[in-house]
Amino acid sequence: MDCVFCAIVAGDLPASRVYDDELVLGFMDLNPATPGHLLVVPKRHAADLAGLDQDDGAHMFRVAQRLAAAVRASAVAPEGINLFLADGEVAGQEVFHAHLHVVPRRRGDGFGVRAVFGSPSREELDHHAREIRTALDASRS
């Protein structure tokens, strides 16, 4: 397996570690969007969100919440925090090991989602809600 995050977890590659427990590792992003940008990575490999163990995923978010609070209290002193998970190449995922970004934010920092948000009709929203509920119900069986 040629996964850079698995190599970091195994200690085969260096990382500026911030947090380490039995399930996840938190470390500084090598290509930060902003100063203080961290990654929270499950130690068990999962290429994407669908493959992520539910307990690992829940723990990853709990740790990200703690790290976000620590970033706010640190000298980084951001005005806000984004938690960001890219799931799939088209969503911007570059390392195919599920992970959560903790991105400290300041006005004018240049980071953000560049989208044009629409105003769909209630009918269209209801249609998509039905489709997603159907898929959700099917996943329970």
Predicted regions and their residues:
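HIT superfamily nucleotide-processing domains
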Residues: M1-S141
